[in-house]
Regions:
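N-terminal beta1-alpha1 cap of cysteine-dependent amidohydrolase-like domains
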Residues: 1-85, 92-113, 118
Length: 120
């Protein structure tokens, strides 16, 4: 399985993702740079975590306007699986590939606590 690992300036989990896809899942990952077109032979795409563009405005908002996102949207229309992890998820929301919006938390500070989630 050919998997594209999208790399933005500030991504810092792309090498970890590449290793897991290659060495654990025995897939064929390839780095896909934010300013280059996606290869046409991909079976899936992963947007890994990190701090794309330093998360200066809102998490993922600048990356959501990178040239590669148009290609990600095109493959999404074809039904090719896309996974966003951490900042990658935020990029998918900011780009409109996932529904909803990202909101600031009540404290306006980083929070690390367990949250219960029910998937319906």
């Amino acid at each position: 399985m050919n998997v594209g690992v999208v790399v933005f300036p500030g991504s810092n989990c792309d090498r970890d993702m590449f290793h897991v896809l290659s060495d654990v899942f025995h897939m064929t990952p390839q780095y896909c740079w934010h300013d280059k077109p996606l290869p046409e032979n991909l079976d899936a795409v992963v947007l890994p975590g990190g701090f794309s563009y330093g998360d200066r405005l809102r998490a993922g908002v600048i990356a959501a306007h990178s040239p590669i996102i148009q290609d990600v949207k095109k493959i999404a229309e074809k039904g090719i699986p896309i996974l966003g992890v951490c900042n990658g998820f935020q990029i998918l929301v900011e780009s409109g590939l996932l529904p909803g919006v990202l909101l600031k938390n009540d404290s306006l500070n980083f929070m690390c606590e367990w949250t219960n989630l029910t998937v319906e």
